[in-house]
Amino acid sequence: MEKFFDSEEAPEQEIDVKNYDTLTQTLKELESGELDLLAMPAELLHGKQLQMYNANCEVLGARTPRTPNMILVSENKLQYQPKSAIILSDSKLVRRQLRRARKGLRVLSTKAFIEINEREEKFEDELEKYSWMEKLRLNEEIDGFIIPRVIYSEVEINGRRHSLLPDPHNLGDSHYLAHPYSDLVVIIGRKNFPKSISELFTETEGDTIWKIQDYFLSSMDEKQLETIGVLVRHRKLSTLMTQAEKHRDLTMEQSFHDLEGEVITNEILVEFKIEKISSDGKRTISLHRVVPYSKHEIAMVTAKKDWMKFLERAEMNEIKFLND
């Protein structure tokens, strides 16, 4: 939010910004009128929405994520890593994505690496932990590590970086969906707060991302979220068609053209992907939808029904990775 307040997009009105440590205290001050709006990471609201509603507050909108994806710090791209290369990642989702993308890697959490090597390491914060990983890499004790993009800019790293992006270079290549709520900031206020004011801080795409992720993920516990990859974004039809042509994706191309080849919509499109990967990376359950913006609320309801059917069918076929 600091970058937003320093940008040209920031409202012209004078804004008094305060930092708070606890959601409980902040909600009390929102309810009493001492505060007007609260901006917070959406992931911190997960599982606490009842507390928000009890304070007579609600999510008024959200900011579009700027840096949702992770970075691999290594001299080599993933496909060029040596056999049995050691990659550290504290994200269960990313470890599974890396195993899916490349066989033969030793993808470990920080805890596992410390235990295997019988070390005694303690870190005061995330910056110290990732600085330690960079030292391991420079000493050639590991081949690389995964770091959130937002933290990467704060750590002194001289090595090459490789972004883990959601769009494969070629159809069927490796892709990396972000964690649930990744870099998503929600704006919370009292019920019936003036929309004309809250809209100064929110974005339409951010609102869509929050609405769909909340609908799909709010009933999941923290453990379930650890293995879910998700992507929600607005797309221009021209951009999507260029991508479909590049990948020779006839299904996508035909979806937005009639029998005579004419475009059937000029609306902004909403793209939604969700997937769950087995611990060894060998199996993936995924769902992908692209719909016009005006139909995205109806589409997310039907998409969730389809997603639940996929999971139920996997359980019926004794695919055990659903709860691993």
Descriptions of predicted regions:
Residues 22-28, 77-80:
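Short acidic low-complexity segments
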Residues 1-24, 96, 100-324:
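Small-molecule-sensing regulatory modules
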Residues 70-87, 101:
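Flexible hinge/capping segments at coil-to-helix
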Residues 26-69:
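Short beta-strand-centered segments that line the small-molecule binding cleft or hinge
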Residues 56-78, 177-193, 197:
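Hydrophobic/proline-rich hinge and linker segments of small-molecule sensing/allosteric domains
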